């Protein structure tokens, strides 16, 4: 009943230690054994650089090109893997004027502005607005992968913006401001009580999975997805079968055809087992 399985990474495929754990490997192996022709697509908010290693790990695990297509930056960029090299299929950049306006709003409210540049090598992340947070992130997290925001970065193109606030109330206020101002041109997702994720209006996971359906001649009614956060909503709305992780927001659970019940190391593998047992044929 399904030809393609779309998977989110963080909070879904990956364990809390950001690994593909043994129960997950076994569940995926059982799934592929039952339907060898099944394709898997990765859909994540991560950058190309931190996504590619998991794509390659899945393909090595199955000893075949299980994952041919994957999208990064919340759906703003789609890739096809060809001879183990990612080839860009499309991208959606945020208008530079919108980037600057969002930066100014975040700076005014003393939040952290983090944006992903459309660049093939480091530094591909820019930080700004709250100078202390930016310094902290650069020193202890992204290091050489990032640099501080300059107007020159606007010409490189921005794929995705993350906005962070320590105070949930302040984040909620800024979310409402940005959402109201750009509701027709940007995807503005309240990812968590500390994070807002922003992409071009068409730069979302739903658009990506629909694009693959058209490109591969697949039916959305024969696709399933697994996710755990509100940036997965767009792909839940497109496909026939959607599986929400047990700790997903209620808004996502309402869209799901099935909801996970486990919160331990089997939280993802139990959903894959369910697909294997019930809907894979």
Swiss-Prot record:
Disulphide bonds in the chain: none
UniProt signal peptide: none
Cofactors named for this entry: Mg(2+)
Annotated residues for binding of phosphate: 9, 44-45, 205, 231
Keywords: Hydrolase, Magnesium, Metal-binding
InterPro entries linked to this entry: Cof, HAD-like_sf, HAD-SF_hydro_IIB, HAD_sf
Binding site for Mg(2+): 8, 10, 228-229
MF terms (GO), sorted A to Z: magnesium ion binding; phosphatase activity
PROSITE patterns: COF_1, COF_2
Entry EC no(s): 3.1.3.-
Pfam families: Hydrolase_3
Active site residues per record: 8
GO annotation, cellular component aspect: cytosol
UniProt record similarity statement: Belongs to the HAD-like hydrolase superfamily. Cof family.
NCBIfam families in the cross-refs: Cof-subfamily, HAD-SF-IIB
Name of the protein this chain belongs to: Putative phosphatase MPN_264
């Amino acid at each position: 009943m399904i030809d393609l399985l779309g998977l989110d990474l963080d909070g879904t495929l990956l364990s809390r230690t950001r690994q593909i754990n043994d129960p997950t490997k076994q569940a995926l192996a059982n799934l592929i054994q039952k339907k060898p022709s099944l394709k898997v697509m990765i859909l994540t908010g991560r950058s190309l650089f931190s996504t590619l290693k998991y794509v390659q790990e899945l393909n090595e695990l199955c000893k075949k090109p299980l994952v041919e297509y994957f999208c990064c930056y919340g759906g703003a960029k789609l890739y096809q893997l060809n001879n183990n090299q990612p080839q860009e299929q499309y991208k959606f950049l945020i208008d530079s004027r919108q980037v600057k306006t969002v930066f100014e709003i975040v700076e005014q409210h003393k939040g952290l502005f983090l944006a992903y540049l459309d660049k093939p090598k480091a530094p591909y992340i820019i930080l700004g607005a709250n100078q202390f947070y930016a310094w902290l992130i650069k020193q202890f997290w992204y290091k050489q992968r990032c640099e501080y925001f300059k107007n020159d970065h606007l010409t490189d193109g921005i794929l995705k913006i993350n906005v962070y606030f320590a105070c949930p109330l302040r984040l909620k206020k800024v979310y409402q401001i940005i959402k109201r101002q750009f509701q027709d041109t940007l995807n503005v997702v309240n990812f968590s009580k500390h994070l807002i994720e922003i992409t071009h209006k068409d730069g979302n996971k739903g658009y990506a999975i629909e694009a693959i359906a058209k490109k591969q001649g697949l039916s959305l009614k024969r696709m399933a997805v697994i996710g755990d956060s509100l940036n997965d909503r767009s792909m839940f709305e497109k496909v026939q079968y959607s599986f929400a992780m047990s700790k997903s927001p209620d808004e996502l659970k309402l869209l799901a055809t099935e909801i996970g019940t486990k919160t331990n190391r089997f939280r993802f593998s139990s959903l894959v087992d369910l697909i294997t047992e019930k809907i894979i044929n």
